[in-house]
């Protein structure tokens, strides 16, 4: 997989202005004291229940730069999955997993009245803390520690004293943007009905965040402090990704309070590889999820603030990223995590031609002091191309309502325990099969949505709801008893395909020839067998796998499970042993797992040529 670095650059030096104040975010030189006035405005359906501590909607009025503003807040009901869990460890190493009640939480999204482009991400747990955008500028707000007072400080990030003003440069500040032409082609594609349905469907990323041991020490060994910081980060992630029709549900939080489960090292690439493997072999066996992010207190070598695999969402090992907790202002840490998750969703670094209407966009190769929460036009097209080409399936699945540990919330678009359907608020609902006020089916309806729901009735048994996508896939059909299409079924792994040139693997037929075409174009073919002997060298030109960052040479019988060697038949390309290799994406150009490497033999995920019956 391609790994993409994110680093920090903060070049401005800000003069001392007025008296300084110490806030959670650091020493702030220039700030405005505001006094919040809660505005009573009971919206339809926004009745506070007697046992509810935090209201579903709130409004506050205060002044910014002497002008009154009204901040509208709405509880982020998509912040947690119904089966959200937290894991930490006892002193003797025992795993302790709990399902804390998170329904009546204090995390909100919002907007400023009469500013159509405004956004807000606010924690209302103890006063208001977070950020809001007003007339294109980002402000931070947090309570002053004055007893029995509504006094808050409002300030800009530029007025926070920096612990280290030394400019930091980026190892990959420039991206060649080699896929720019592909982006143009993707936007001009005539999509199949299946691709169009996929693009239009809302996406749900079930996220697990892991905080390492240094984070535990950094925040005074306080599980509560770390939990609060991560909740605030995920609340902002939801604001950022909502524009892409993506909902992020935190399904798990794990804190390594008794020591790290992997070696968390200053070498970001090594740490990411170790974390991805741990996710695949350990975390996924304990907690079903789509994506994992490691939040670490370690300082990576150089200016690196994060690292993520490119185009890897739903992959067991590579749907992951690592992020350094590099700033007291959690807004900037959230931007770094949004950036790494953007790589997982197929977005590369922005080139000079990319724009988002701000000085810096989410997928800029550097994280600047003037960062915005917007994706550039390039990022949005790159993401769209990735969805069209790869169609990752796990993010189509809403978080399950089974194993629910908190009360259902009608109107959050998630069907939870006790609900038949959920089409949003009565104002937004456009589904005639669902009563938005009760989240129950309308009279006479059997279903409200699903691939096997046809005009509020279950589809006829045997109706194809998911056509076969190639010879290694099978068509899935409706049962007549449910609105949902059954679990996607594939031809069994190891079944011969492509005229016995390959074996089916997770619904695809990976063969060397197609992989060469994918890398070098239609004129490419597989190189001669002699070329694959370079995989015995154990360097960038040939190896079978990496262990702790070290390239392991292929054994003689495994050479066709290492780097892929191709021959491009175009006259201008004379190299008979051509590979795809660049330092920033070392894993691209390796032979895909499941590829046939001999009669009855296939490549394992560990780069070994093994019996096809044991390869999977």
Curated annotation (Swiss-Prot):
Modified sites of kind Pyrrolidone carboxylic acid (Glu)? 194
**Which EC numbers does the record give?**
3.4.24.-
Enzyme class name: hydrolase
> What is the regulatory mechanism acting on its activity?
The proteolytic activity requires Zn(2+) and Ca(2+) ions. The alpha-fibrinogenase activity is completely inhibited by EDTA, but not by PMSF.
Q: Where is this motif: Metal-binding?
A: 339-350
Compartmental location = Secreted
Molecular function in Gene Ontology: metal ion binding; metalloendopeptidase activity; toxin activity
Tissue specificity as recorded in UniProt? Expressed by the venom gland (at protein level). Expressed by the venom gland.
Q: Which residues form the propeptide?
A: 21-193
SMART domains, per the entry: ACR, DISIN
Which residues of the sequence carry a binding annotation for Zn(2+)? Answer: 339, 343, 349
Cysteine pairs forming cystine bridges in this chain are 314-394, 354-378, 356-361, 410-439, 421-434, 423-429, 433-456, 447-453, 452-478, 465-485, 472-504, 497-509, 516-566, 531-577, 544-554, 561-603, 597-609
Q: Which residues bind Ca(2+) 1?
A: 409, 412, 416, 419, 422
Stored PANTHER family: ADAM A DISINTEGRIN AND METALLOPROTEASE DOMAIN (PTHR11905), DISINTEGRIN AND METALLOPROTEINASE DOMAIN-CONTAINING PROTEIN 28 (PTHR11905:SF32)
Instruction: Name the family the entry cites.
Output: Belongs to the venom metalloproteinase (M12B) family. P-III subfamily. P-IIIc sub-subfamily.
Q: What is this protein called?
A: Zinc metalloproteinase-disintegrin-like protein H3
């Amino acid at each position: 997989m391609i790994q993409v670095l994110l680093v920090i650059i903060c070049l401005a030096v800000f003069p001392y202005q007025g008296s300084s104040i110490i806030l959670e975010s650091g020493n702030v030189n220039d700030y405005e004291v505001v006094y919040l006035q809660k505005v009573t405005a009971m919206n339809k359906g926004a009745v506070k229940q007697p046992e509810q501590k935090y209201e579903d909607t709130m409004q506050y009025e205060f002044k910014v730069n002497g002008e009154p503003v009204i901040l509208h807040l709405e509880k982020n009901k998509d912040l947690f999955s119904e089966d959200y869990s937290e894991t930490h460890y006892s002193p003797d190493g025992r795993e302790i997993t709990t399902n804390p009640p998170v329904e009546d939480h204090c995390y909100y999204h919002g907007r400023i009245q009469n500013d159509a482009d405004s956004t807000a991400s606010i924690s209302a747990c103890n006063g208001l803390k977070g950020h809001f955008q007003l007339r294109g500028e980002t402000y931070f707000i947090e309570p002053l520690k004055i007893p029995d007072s509504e006094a808050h400080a409002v300030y800009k990030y530029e007025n926070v004293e920096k612990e280290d003003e030394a400019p930091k440069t980026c190892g990959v500040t420039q991206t060649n943007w080699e896929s720019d032409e592909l982006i143009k082609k993707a936007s001009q594609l005539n999509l199949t009905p299946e691709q169009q349905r996929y693009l239009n469907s809302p996406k749900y990323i079930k996220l697990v965040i892991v905080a390492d041991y240094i984070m535990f020490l950094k925040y005074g060994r306080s599980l509560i402090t770390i939990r609060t910081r991560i909740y605030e980060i995920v609340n902002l992630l939801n604001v950022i990704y909502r524009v892409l029709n993506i909902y992020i549900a935190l399904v798990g939080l794990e804190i390594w309070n008794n020591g790290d489960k992997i070696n968390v090292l200053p070498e970001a690439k090594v740490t990411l590889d170790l974390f991805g493997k741990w996710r695949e072999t350990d975390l996924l066996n304990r907690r079903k999820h789509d994506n994992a992010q490691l939040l670490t207190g370690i300082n990576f070598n150089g200016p690196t603030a994060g690292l993520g695999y490119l185009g890897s969402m739903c992959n067991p090992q590579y749907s992951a990223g690592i992020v350094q907790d590099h700033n007291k202002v959690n807004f900037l840490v959230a931007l770094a995590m949004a950036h790494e998750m953007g790589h997982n969703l197929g977005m590369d670094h922005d080139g000079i031609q990319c724009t988002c209407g701000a000085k810096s966009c989410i997928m800029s190769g550097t994280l600047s002091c003037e960062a915005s929460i917007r994706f550039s036009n390039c990022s949005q097209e790159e993401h769209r191309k990735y969805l069209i080409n790869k169609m990752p399936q796990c993010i189509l699945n809403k978080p399950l309502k089974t194993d629910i540990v908190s009360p259902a919330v009608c109107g959050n678009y998630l069907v939870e325990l006790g609900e038949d359907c959920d089409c949003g608020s009565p104002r937004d609902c456009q589904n005639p099969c669902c009563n938005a006020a009760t989240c129950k089916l309308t009279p006479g309806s059997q279903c409200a949505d699903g691939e096997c729901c046809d005009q509020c009735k279950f589809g006829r048994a045997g109706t194809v709801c998911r056509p076969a996508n190639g010879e290694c896939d099978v068509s899935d059909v409706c049962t007549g008893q449910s609105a949902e299409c059954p679990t996607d079924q594939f031809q069994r792994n190891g079944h011969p395909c492509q005229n016995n040139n390959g074996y089916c693997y997770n619904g695809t037929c990976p063969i060397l020839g197609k992989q060469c075409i994918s890398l070098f174009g239609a004129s490419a073919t597989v190189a001669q067998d002699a070329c694959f002997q370079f995989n015995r060298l154990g360097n960038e030109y040939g190896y079978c796998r990496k262990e702790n960052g070290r390239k392991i040479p292929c054994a003689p019988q495994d050479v066709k499970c290492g780097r892929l060697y191709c021959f491009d038949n175009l006259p201008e390309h004379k190299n008979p042993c051509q590979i795809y290799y660049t330092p920033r994406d070392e894993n691209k150009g390796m032979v895909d797992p499941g590829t046939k490497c001999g009669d009855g033999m296939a490549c394992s995920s560990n780069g070994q040529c093994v019996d096809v019956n044991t390869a999977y």
